[in-house]
Amino acid sequence: MNQHLLEQFGTTHERVERGLAALRTGQGVLVADDADRENEGDLIFAAETLTPAQMAMMIRECSGIVCLCLPEERVSRLGLPMMVAHNTSSMGTAFTISIEAAEGVTTGVSAADRVRTVKAAIDDAACPGCLRSPGHVFPLRASPGGVLERRGHTEATVDLMRLAGLKPYGVLCELTNPDGTMARLPQLVDFAQRNRMTVLTVEDLVAYRQDKGL
């Protein structure tokens, strides 16, 4: 990881704290993973404060595969089966079947419809009947131990929400360049500067949790 690019966002702990503060106020954060892993950066928002404008940004600036990160208990409550019985993904990404809100959407693909689907899935009264499949939102099941168990964006998202005191549900999408290639740290930092966001890394979050015994 190119640390000098990250220094403008503070120390390891400061970057995490800034990210948590941003999430608490309904803003997004950018999270980069290890250079020897996916070497990608994700735009992340809290599911409970997500707006259609923020969803539109994710659709416009990112890969378009908008994912809803959920802890295991929420996946079970919604009755969502995993996308495949035998996961052969190189990173072990835990996709469930895709979802759509059962009510309040049209085709399900617009920013507003996708937000409606997210809100339906995280509602306190949510149940399997609140959703339809397939759909245009892709849930991801986080490992119970968070980033201390798996250093993925899914776990980082759920960990950040919990540390921020929010519901443990977040939405992510991989940031891409205008030509469709994946954004790396330099492009991630540039995007953050242009959009007044902060950048942190999965490694920062691991260190933060370990140092604080969380």
Curated annotation (Swiss-Prot):
InterPro entries: DHBP_synth_RibB-like_a/b_dom (IPR017945), DHBP_synthase_RibB (IPR000422). Its cofactor is Mg(2+); Mn(2+). Mg(2+) 2 binds at E38, H153. This is 3,4-dihydroxy-2-butanone 4-phosphate synthase. GO terms for cellular component: cytosol. It is an enzyme of class 4 (lyase). Catalyzes the conversion of D-ribulose 5-phosphate to formate and 3,4-dihydroxy-2-butanone 4-phosphate. Its EC number is 4.1.99.12. Keywords: Lyase, Magnesium, Manganese, Metal-binding, Riboflavin biosynthesis. Mg(2+) 1 binds at E38. Belongs to the DHBP synthase family. Pfam families: DHBP_synthase (PF00926). Pathway: Cofactor biosynthesis; riboflavin biosynthesis; 2-hydroxy-3-oxobutyl phosphate from D-ribulose 5-phosphate: step 1/1. One of its GO terms (molecular function) is 3,4-dihydroxy-2-butanone-4-phosphate synthase activity. The record marks H136, E174 as: Essential for catalytic activity. It catalyses: D-ribulose 5-phosphate = (2S)-2-hydroxy-3-oxobutyl phosphate + formate + H(+). Binds 2 divalent metal cations per subunit. Magnesium or manganese. One of its GO terms (biological process) is riboflavin biosynthetic process. It comes from the Bacteria. SUPFAM superfamilies: YrdC/RibB.
